[in-house]
Amino acid sequence: MMSFEEEQLRDHAVVNLYRIGAIRFGDFILSDGKKTPIYVDMRLVISCPDVLQTIASLIWRLRPSFNSSLLCGVPYTALTLATCISLKYNISMVLRRKELKHPNQEDKIKVEGLFSPGQTCLVINDVIASGRSILDTAKALEDEGLNIRESLVFLDRQVGGADALKEAGIKLRSVFTLEELVKALLSKCQLSETDAAIARTLLETF
């Protein structure tokens, strides 16, 4: 059962993400080409330390019971989240490079930081859609000998990402599903009439 403190953190996150414009309603196209009436832009939280820390706390509450000595944020939006979690909870972090540091050398560096093969690493992300970015990050980490068992995210858009991760042997844990987020927006935020109408229509699709 959710604690009162966690409920407060969730409410704070939703209200403030909408307030700063990180959650918007309208007509948007995702990176995979699919259309959506709601867009969540977590890049804006870097300018709002209190919101960033709230989201980091919510994500960290999802952590599994087994010991994980490392975490890695999916580049690039989740790097700030991962860094915040690392500093707040004193857990080591590694960095996956999307662009290789030495592309013309044999010793191409894919993962930066101090780690040893066999360690377990949690993959942190802000939003999951198809799951491709998490899977790409997991593969880079596994290529270096790290074990990837779970991924923690703020929002699951519920468009197949969790199933894609499951097929790869990775369990997904999310603070919100898209359905839960929309319900929270309707109950906790003072949405404009237009946004509220879009939110109610979106809920009917779940």
From Swiss-Prot:
Domain of life: Bacteria
EC top class, as a word: transferase
Catalytic activity as recorded in UniProt: orotidine 5'-phosphate + diphosphate = orotate + 5-phospho-alpha-D-ribose 1-diphosphate
UniProt-listed GO biological process terms: 'de novo' UMP biosynthetic process; pyrimidine nucleobase biosynthetic process
Pathway where this protein functions: Pyrimidine metabolism; UMP biosynthesis via de novo pathway; UMP from orotate: step 1/2
Residues holding orotate: 157
The UniProt record lists the keyword Cell membrane: no
Cofactor(s) this protein cannot do without: Mg(2+)
EC number(s) recorded for this UniProt protein: 2.4.2.10
UniProt function note: Catalyzes the transfer of a ribosyl phosphate group from 5-phosphoribose 1-diphosphate to orotate, leading to the formation of orotidine monophosphate (OMP).
Subunit structure as annotated in this protein's UniProt entry: Homodimer.
Protein name: Orotate phosphoribosyltransferase
Organism, as annotated: Chlamydia caviae (strain ATCC VR-813 / DSM 19441 / 03DC25 / GPIC)
Gene field: pyrE
